[in-house]
């Protein structure tokens, strides 16, 4: 199996600490710091400027994490849905301006949905209609901007559900993201399949992966090797994917990036 090149998720002010590792090999880089209200309002221009400065001379692939807290794309209140759309569109503007080719958004699917989807007539159809109400303008804007929206699993139990949602837009501007830790936590909490199954189910809709480890109790965002995930099988599944997803370490302690990279490199999985 050929080792895969990986990068990391960092806020602009954190990039300098990992500059040589990221820049010399043109690794994948996901910008963080564009998800909160003040990031996209009062501090918007300052954050754009800081990101552009930190990225000067960078030739790798750039992504950005979009907003998520309180912004469920399946909001049942029709007066609130346009506000969520507007917030996503503002984040998309930031992604375009900093040169990102991807923007991460969170999945609206939960354990409750997985266990109740056949318990209510038209549950899937009604949920999907609300999602389209919020997301159709964002997907169309992403098409124009040349940015791919990648939908990250959070509480997802059945990866096929999120894939069906993405497929329903019939657009290259929306695809799938996997967070390895979230997938493993869903396995522990909700009986979801293992992480490699999430990757294999996504197939060539997979465009982005958050690499993080955990103990199955909480969303730890530990360095690979510190938790329970079976990394060899995860990377076997990723190696089968021909869509060349962005692969980024998303760690709670950015100082652990070298440790996580060294662990995976020692297994012969990354370069």
Across the structure, where does each feature detected by a protein language model lie?
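Alpha-helix-loop-beta-strand connector modules within alpha/beta enzyme cores
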Residues: 50-69, 128-144, 231-237
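Active-site acidic/histidine proton-transfer and metal-coordination neighborhood
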Residues: 74-175
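A cross-domain feature marking catalytic cores of carbohydrate-active enzymes
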Residues: 8-12, 31-33, 64-68, 105-107, ...
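Charged helix-capping and loop-helix junction motifs
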Residues: 43-50, 81-88, 124, 132, ...
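N-terminal pre-domain/capping segments
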Residues: 1-96, 269-271
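Histidine-acidic metal/acid-base catalytic patches
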Residues: 1-5, 14-27, 73-74, 101, ...
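Feature marks short, surface-exposed loop/turn motifs that line or immediately flank catalytic pockets
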Residues: 35-37, 68-70, 109-113, 157, ...
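Short, flexible loop segments at the rims of nucleotide/cofactor-binding pockets, characterized by
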Residues: 6-9, 81, 127, 152-154, ...
